[in-house]
């Protein structure tokens, strides 16, 4: 994602503002548009790590993410001349719907430029909110360039997804809500892409209680902000590789970089495996649908938890399609040792399949799928057949036990996954 650059003087101008007052103003702007999301205590994570873990479910918002806060605050602060000309944004995700919804509420014309790769579901959702959607280019950068071109041509106000002071002040209202409900919170875990969400929350929280730790979380394949802070200057990643597309940003914003560098206490990294497991836990334990970027803070709890600590995780959004959910659930089940697939060679004689089935049943392995192929063998002249079995298991220790029992009965097991 390219970033609309701010001049150095602009960054310093915004850094010197009264952040608390501007975020309180944003709260006032938003009061008739959205309700504060509640803090939900996670009994699962609290028991798992012997601390108090709370979730802040921004996936409960209209349009399914926190983005409405910043977009609406930006539009609410526009002058009448700007509003009359309309607004424009570029996005393939939550920002598009946040801007479209906010513009509809304020009665302002909105144009959203989306790349060709945008799922039809998101295109239609954005159109349903009254926005004029333009499909352009093969990647986000192409859509961004087109949006800037149209902004200059027609005088539209560009609503940046993160590197805008009014936008991040809107996101900062989340921080106010947390402190109103849990004033003795120790740490707040926040996903980082371009940095708008964490910047806003950091400004809000640190202006009221500087002792609260603000912790950023990034996927291992999208570490632009972490690398930039560590190197002391804005860095651009050559490539991105993460399932958490909502935080897949090659370069942080100029303003968000300065705020993060000054106010964020630490940035931790999580793996793709961590993220997939967190999606599964969100569904199974929290009974809550959250997108991959949304659960990134949950994936980092084990890295920050300690006895008695009060931790809040920002669940930034819940816009995820059912096909993706299905795939991630399966990967999460495999990762947590809930499913195992293995192959075993059997002598091609009666009773061998039954013996395997009995051993699995005796060890509480529920067979999900079984393929018994007499024409499939490692050595075609060995007079053996290959059996492939997928079983439901109860964790990695259960898998180890099953493999051990089969091997004790002279079966050679090859793990597939």
Enumerate the language-model features and the residues they cover:
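PLP-dependent amino-acid enzyme catalytic core
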Residues: 3-417
